[in-house]
Design a protein with these regions (language model features):
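An N-terminally biased module of ancient metal coordination in phosphate/nucleic-acid-related enzymes
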Residues: 1-82
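Extended substrate/RNA-proximal surfaces in nucleic-acid metabolism proteins
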Residues: 58-156
Length: 156
């Protein structure tokens, strides 16, 4: 029996490690394509691809190049009618100075103002909170906290 996916609500996966070989997601193009097809069958029509960006390991330019190459590898097997639309972004590991780092503007979700930020799990100092606010008010981005369940219980 086939499932009629047209009657499912349109779902958006807002945090996915779907690009092959980028981080802890699929290792191969085949695995990534199978995951995309499965997501589509479950009603997912849009995926925010949020590969890890660790500023202590690489600069934004090299990350963007790696991400573009990984996304390019998916194109050969891509079947748009059976797969969700992918919006490229990043899961940016917080670093002090984030609120003044203009290159992170290139790591937003699909060119939107939304920046997925992985915050430290320990209690945040006032300086860290101020820095996160600068992401909003200096860079003009809207930070979204990734894995809030890991860090918000530690906050006052």
């Amino acid at each position: 029996m086939t499932q009629n996916t047209e009657k499912l609500p349109e779902l958006i996966d807002v945090h996915s490690h779907i690009l092959p070989g980028m981080d802890d997601g699929p290792k191969t193009v085949g695995e990534a394509l199978a995951m995309l097809e499965a997501a589509y069958r479950q009603g997912v029509r849009r995926i925010w691809s949020t590969s890890h960006f660790y500023p202590q390991k690489e600069d934004p330019a090299s990350f963007l190049k790696r991400r573009a190459e990984a996304a390019g590898r998916l194109k050969d097997g891509w079947r748009a009618s059976l797969m969700p639309k992918i919006y490229l972004g990043a899961e940016v590991a917080y670093f002090f100075g984030l609120g003044r780092c203009k290159p992170v503007c290139d790591l937003t979700i699909g060119g939107s103002p939304f920046l997925l930020v992985e915050m430290p799990p320990e209690r945040w100092s006032d300086d860290v909170v101020d820095d996160l606010l600068m992401v909003r008010y200096v860079l003009g981005l809207r930070p979204i906290i990734a894995h809030e369940e890991r860090c918000l219980p530690e906050q006052p």
